């Protein structure tokens, strides 16, 4: 259903870093590029408009679907690191809070894709929580606190007491 190739990142012709994507059926990067998709996979999928980090659903939703994902080691994409781009400058912008809103949207749309709020989704949400916190780490303290409270509410709403992390490194996140 999805074929994912390897990629490299570069700042200039002299600064190139090749990603070492393992050839596995289970790993899919969150990037929308560097992949071939079967038409039916994206037939009803739409990137959320007006948000930064709109590619979050690729890993949050599509990776949770019962799809066959194959990776190949061939380099199929070159990603230029842009020091003025959203990824590099997001933490300085008020739009960085979009990372939370897209996460909330992903969880709201699970039923649209026939997905369940299971252990895999819970573990992903914990990892996404760290990503979101990193993206807003330069925002005012009140914004960071509000995002923390909203994230806590999401966890209670969708997972209540039915999931606990199996990842030792995520236990501190879970306790917070």
Task: Report residues per predicted region.
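Secondary-structure edge/capping motif, primarily at the C-terminal ends of alpha-helices
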Residues: 110-114, 133-141
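Amphipathic alpha-helical repeat scaffolds of TPR domains
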Residues: 120-135
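Conserved donor NDP-sugar-binding/catalytic core segment of glycosyltransferases
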Residues: 1-16
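Membrane-interface aromatic/basic loop that binds lipid-linked glycans or pyrophosphate carriers
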Residues: 138-176
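C-terminal, non-catalytic tails of nucleotide-sugar-dependent glycosyltransferases
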Residues: 101-121, 155-169
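Conserved nucleotide-sugar donor-binding catalytic segment
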Residues: 20-99
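A structural signal for short, well-ordered beta-strand segments and their strand-loop junctions
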Residues: 3-4, 70-72, 119-121
């Amino acid at each position: 259903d999805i074929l994912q190739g390897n990629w490299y990142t570069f700042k200039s012709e002299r600064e190139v870093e090749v990603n070492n994507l393992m050839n596995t059926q289970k790993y899919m990067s969150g990037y929308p590029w560097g992949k071939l998709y079967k038409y039916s996979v994206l037939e009803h999928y739409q990137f959320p408009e007006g948000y930064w980090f709109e590619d979050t659903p690729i890993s949050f939703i599509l990776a949770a679907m019962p799809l066959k994902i194959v990776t190949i080691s061939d380099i199929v994409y070159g990603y230029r690191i842009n020091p003025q781009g959203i990824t590099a400058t997001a933490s300085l912008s008020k739009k960085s809070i979009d990372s939370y809103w897209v996460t909330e949207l992903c969880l709201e749309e699970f039923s649209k894709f026939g997905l369940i709020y299971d252990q895999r989704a819970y573990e992903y949400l914990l990892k996404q929580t760290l990503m979101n916190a990193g993206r807003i780490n330069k925002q005012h303290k009140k914004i960071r606190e509000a995002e923390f409270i909203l994230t806590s509410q999401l966890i209670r709403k969708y997972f209540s007491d039915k999931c606990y992390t199996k990842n030792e490194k995520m236990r501190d996140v879970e306790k917070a």
